[in-house]
Amino acid sequence: MKTYAVLLALVVAFVCIAESTGYPVEDLEDDELTELEAEALLEDLLEDLELEDLDYNEEARSWASMAKKLKEYMEKLKQRAG
C-alpha cells in the first residue's frame, strides 16, 4: 500500500511540475488550412505552373517528333503491304 501512495505522490508531483513549466500550446487547428482551401491553393499553383504550349517543352518536342516519325513509318508499312 505504501508503494501505491509513493507512486501516486510521484505522479501528482510530475503533473504539478508539468503544469507549472508548461510550454504555450499553439492552436494549430485555427491556423491550418481547411482541405478545400488547400485544394484551391494547389489548383491555382498547378495552373500557374502549367505550360501554355507543350511544343516548347524539350521533352514534349521529342515525344511529338517520335510520334510523328512513328505515324510516317506506319503509313510506309501500309503502303508496302497494300
From Swiss-Prot:
Excised during maturation, the propeptide residues are: 23-61
A GO biological-process term: defense response to bacterium
Summary of the tissues where the protein is detected:
Expressed by the venom gland.
The main location class comes to secreted
Q: Where is this motif: Processing quadruplet motif?
A: 58-61
- Annotated GO MF terms: toxin activity
Q: Which domain of life is it from?
A: Eukaryota
Post-translational modification, briefly?
Answer: Cleavage of the propeptide depends on the processing quadruplet motif (XXXR, with at least one of X being E).
Q: Record's InterPro entries?
A: Latarcin_precursor
Q: Which residues form the signal peptide?
A: 1-22
Q: Which UniProt keywords apply?
A: Amidation, Antibiotic, Antimicrobial, Fungicide, Secreted, Signal, Toxin
Location in the cell reads: Secreted
Which residues are annotated as modified residue Alanine amide in the UniProt record?
A: 81
Q: Which GO terms describe its cellular component?
A: extracellular region
Q: Which family does it belong to?
A: Belongs to the cationic peptide 03 (latarcin) family. 03 subfamily.
Reported function: It has antimicrobial activity against Gram-positive bacteria (A.globiformis VKM Ac-1112 (MIC=0.7 uM), and B.subtilis VKM B-501 (MIC=2.9 uM)), Gram-negative bacteria (E.coli DH5-alpha (MIC=23 uM), E.coli MH1 (MIC=28 uM), and P.aeruginosa PAO1 (MIC>45 uM)), and yeasts (P.pastoris GS115 (MIC=23 uM), and S.cerevisiae Y190 (MIC=23 uM)). Does not have hemolytic against rabbit erythrocytes. Causes paralysis, but is not lethal when injected into insect (M.domestica) larvae.
Domain annotation text? The mature peptide (62-81) probably forms alpha-helices which disrupt target cell membranes.
Q: What is the recorded name of this protein?
A: M-zodatoxin-Lt3b
Its source organism is Lachesana tarabaevi
